[in-house]
UniProtKB/Swiss-Prot annotation:
Pfam family, one: MDM10
Family statement drawn from the similarity comment of this UniProt entry: Belongs to the MDM10 family.
Topology in the lipid bilayer: Multi-pass membrane protein
Subunit structure: Component of the ER-mitochondria encounter structure (ERMES) or MDM complex, composed of MMM1, MDM10, MDM12 and MDM34. Associates with the mitochondrial outer membrane sorting assembly machinery SAM(core) complex.
GO cellular component: ERMES complex; SAM complex
Domain topic, free-text comment: Lacks alpha-helical transmembrane segments, suggesting that it resides in the membrane via beta-sheet conformations similar to those predicted for other outer membrane proteins and porin.
Subcellular location: Mitochondrion outer membrane
Ranges that cross the membrane: none
GO biological-process terms attached to the record: establishment of mitochondrion localization; mitochondrial genome maintenance; mitochondrial outer membrane translocase complex assembly; mitochondrion-endoplasmic reticulum membrane tethering; phospholipid transport; protein insertion into mitochondrial outer membrane
Membrane keyword on record: yes
Keywords on record: Membrane, Mitochondrion, Mitochondrion outer membrane, Transmembrane, Transmembrane beta strand
Function description: Component of the ERMES/MDM complex, which serves as a molecular tether to connect the endoplasmic reticulum and mitochondria. Components of this complex are involved in the control of mitochondrial shape and protein biogenesis and may function in phospholipid exchange. MDM10 is involved in the late assembly steps of the general translocase of the mitochondrial outer membrane (TOM complex). Functions in the TOM40-specific route of the assembly of outer membrane beta-barrel proteins, including the association of TOM40 with the receptor TOM22 and small TOM proteins.
Name this protein carries in UniProt: Mitochondrial distribution and morphology protein 10
Length: 450
């Protein structure tokens, strides 16, 4: 489950009409959400609030083993009037990343002017709603106790196709009397719909980097030729994207290089009852280290998704195999009120196979719209989610996240073979030299937002 400030930051992207999916950094976002999720390792409490449409705060306290905390503040020039901020109203699917549906490339939408107050009473309009002010976000977090760390984030939408991001991190050792060390990361994003590019510079070893992503197919910036009706009747069914990244540090003489491909089905490909399930395939290569990784993610039903990853290194001949899944659950009362046909758990299967449903009256348009769109109703209907992943070494992580009354709970456990460094002479060792198997971590995280 992402933090409340991350949720507000995503709401800022949506309000400013910035497409965060058209980036090489998010090439494997679906597989990462299903396979690389983290579990809480201790007790953690988060108290958050969106006190005004422009200002949010978060207080965090962690315990078990050690006590620490953080204080976060966030300000945005775009009013987030339509963003649910109470923990009882926040859509759970907005907080828990899962299968991410890719949409056809489109022309970047001009960020809304601040004088667009449609539906907003004049009494709640603030002085920050200046038509000359560009969409901007300011975020600062102070981590306590020592070593004290201060992080800051500045995001500004410079134009409809360009966005600037500045991130700073400053830390100071507990007993050090010297000036705090600070690192600045500058990123410039450029998105045209057809392709996207990212330039970055970090003061840490003077690191320079570039990322790019190219979408094959028609260019959304160019007008379609021929009959517009025929163009609408033949929508894109899939999207193939290719990209890469390169890094170089003149100080440490470090070079980094990677490239990748992504093939994903689009919503138009799965609207037909006889079509396949939505899926995403990715292939990433790192030539310098000889690493190769492939992922396959499948949305088997509106509430069930699977993902797998296979990695291989041509130099060391080491391999990695990971599999995971997520299962969403919702209460029967909400299912019957919002989606009457969803009471039958096999309705979606009959719909995909084209078999008429005689037991329950199914509305195909209603079911398909729920299957593919991340609407507020489907988000509210989801009460909890279970995630499980396992690799070839039998490292298992299980995570449950859901809503309990006014609280958002995240509970997880990690199991796996213990490392030899943590084994004592009395620790049992399995035949063949295998180490013992047991608990690695258990934790609970609680979030309350008002």
């Amino acid at each position: 489950m992402c933090d409340f400030m991350d949720y507000i930051q995503l709401a800022f992207y949506d309000a400013s009409k910035w497409n965060r999916d058209n980036s090489y950094s998010r090439l494997t976002t679906t597989a990462n959400a299903l396979l690389d999720f983290s579990t809480p390792e201790r007790l953690k409490v988060n108290l958050s609030s969106l006190s005004t449409p422009h200002f949010a705060t978060t207080y965090t306290l962690g315990t078990v083993g050690l006590i620490d905390g953080s204080i976060s503040y966030l300000f945005t020039t775009i009013p987030l009037h339509n963003t649910p901020s109470r923990s009882s109203l926040i859509p759970l699917r907005k907080l828990v990343p899962g299968y991410r549906q890719i949409y056809p490339p489109s022309i970047p939408i001009e960020y809304p002017t601040a004088n667009d107050h449609s539906g907003i009473p004049a009494a709640v309009r603030s002085k920050a709603d200046n038509p000359k002010m560009k969409p901007t976000l300011l975020h600062a977090t102070l981590h306590l106790p020592p070593p004290t760390t201060l992080t800051g984030l500045f995001i500004c939408r410079l134009s409809s196709t360009t966005q600037l991001s500045l991130a700073v991190c400053s830390s100071r050792a507990p007993a050090s009397k010297s000036a705090p060390q600070a690192t600045l990361l500058t990123q410039i994003f450029h998105d045209t719909g057809k392709y996207s590019s990212e330039f970055l510079f970090s003061t840490d070893n003077a690191l320079l980097g570039f990322k790019g992503l190219w979408n094959f197919g028609p260019d959304p910036r160019k007008p379609t030729r021929g009959d517009p009706a025929s163009q609408r009747s033949r929508p894109l069914l899939s999207l193939l994207s290719a990209g890469g990244e390169v890094y170089y540090s003149p100080v440490s003489s470090v070079v980094g290089l990677s490239t990748g491909l992504r093939f994903a089905t689009l919503p138009a490909a799965t609207e037909n009852a006889h079509s396949a399930f939505p899926y995403t395939l990715t292939l990433t290569l790192t030539p310098l280290t000889g690493s190769m990784s492939t992922t396959y993610s499948l949305l088997a039903s509106p509430n069930l998704a699977f993902s797998s990853r296979f990695g291989f290194n041509v130099y060391s001949w080491e391999s990695e195999m990971v599999a995971g899944c997520e299962l969403w659950r919702r209460s029967k009362s909400k299912s019957q009120n919002i989606y009457p046909s969803a009471v039958d758990n096999l309705a979606w299967a009959r719909l995909k196979m084209g078999v008429p449903d005689t037991a329950v009256s199914v509305n195909p348009e209603h079911e398909l719209s729920y299957f593919h769109k991340e609407g507020h109703n489907s988000s509210h209907a989801s009460d909890s989610v279970i995630k499980v992943r396992v690799d070839q070494s039998w490292n298992i992580r299980a995570l449950w996240e859901g809503r309990v009354k006014e609280l958002l709970i995240s509970a997880g456990v990690a199991l796996g073979p213990a490392s030899r460094s943590t084994l004592s002479y009395a620790s049992p060792v399995a035949p063949g030299g295998l180490s013992s198997y047991g608990w690695k971590s258990v934790g609970v995280s609680v979030l309350y937002a008002s």
